[in-house]
Amino acid sequence: EEIINTLPTDADVSKFEMLEKLMESIYEEMKEFAKKKPDELLNKFKVKNINRVLSQIKEIMKHEPTDEFLDLLDEDSLPSNSDCIIIIGQYRAAIVQYRSQYHYYSDRALGRAWHTQGHPQGQPK
């Protein structure tokens, strides 16, 4: 029973998959900015938009060991492009860890499946 409660919900998985794609898009954009102008500061608009994605990922991963390493970007002391890439890199690593923990190959599901509270034995995805 306790193990099932620590599994993500089906809603968490759906949201996670959407946020994972958004995170990759942000990473690719910020990587380009960091290559061209690593020390240039982000503006408040970018920080707010990036934090909107990061905060939702952080919420899904609040019970994971990686949570303590997931910081939001500081809106007051605007981070540089290279600082942003470091933070996003930590989220990307946490996403890989999360996926490897709860997503697996299942013969029964004939493909990849998620362990969730509603489907502790796995749900095809």
Where do the language-model regions lie?
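Generic structural concept
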Residues: 10-13, 17-27, 47-54, 58, ...
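Short terminal alpha-helical segments
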Residues: 1-43
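Acidic-enriched, low-complexity/disordered segments with a strong bias for Aspartate over Glutamate
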Residues: 10-12, 39, 67, 71-76, ...
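Amphipathic alpha-helical binding modules
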Residues: 76-125
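Amphipathic alpha-helical interaction modules
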Residues: 28-72
